[in-house]
Amino acid sequence: STGLPTRTQQGDLLSTAFLSHGDTAHPVLLPGSVEECFTFGHQAFDLAERLQAPLFVLSDLDLGMNQWMAEPFEYPDRPMDRGKVLDGEALARLGGFARYRDVDGDGICWRTLPGTDHPRAAYFTRGTGHDEAAAYSERADVYERNLARLARKLEGARTLLPGLVVAGEGAEVGVI
């Protein structure tokens, strides 16, 4: 789209943040400069892996249509943060593996990656109604526990995301 559809609106933010079936939300990064576009772009990959969730970076007409001066960007000199990943050796040490068990209490569960060489590495998840072992369930208590876990994960995500920028202290008018 061009013109009015490219201007950021509250509806864009709400649609992106709550883009899903059911009661869930997703982190959204809103860059305010070309430097932040670059930085948030590569941070989004790490955060999406760590949180095991879609993470969105929204740009708008102002950033996309104007010419900006910027210092050369520095690429990260660290490996990608894959988050809580169990390999075959870790699975062998565990008594059992439940894909959606919140071991650490932060809402982010340990996971395996495709190709992990261990018989307990694979799992199948059907929909949002599942128990800790990824088995399908429509039981209210199971769904309530899952929603509570997702709420803990989203709350913890706030500490991982870039902080808000507040400028113009003492101003009579604020723009959000």
Feature map (PLM): residue ranges:
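A short, small-residue-rich loop immediately preceding and capping a beta-strand
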Residues: 1, 30, 176
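Acidic, glycine-rich active-site loops and adjacent beta-strand->loop/helix elements
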Residues: 1, 33-35, 61-64
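Active-site/ligand-binding-proximal alpha/beta "capping" segment
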Residues: 23-46
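Flexible, low-complexity linker and terminal segments
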Residues: 40, 45-176
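Flexible glycine/proline-rich, aromatic-decorated loop/lid segments
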Residues: 1-23, 76, 80
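Glycine-rich, flexible loop/turn motifs
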Residues: 9-12, 25, 157-162
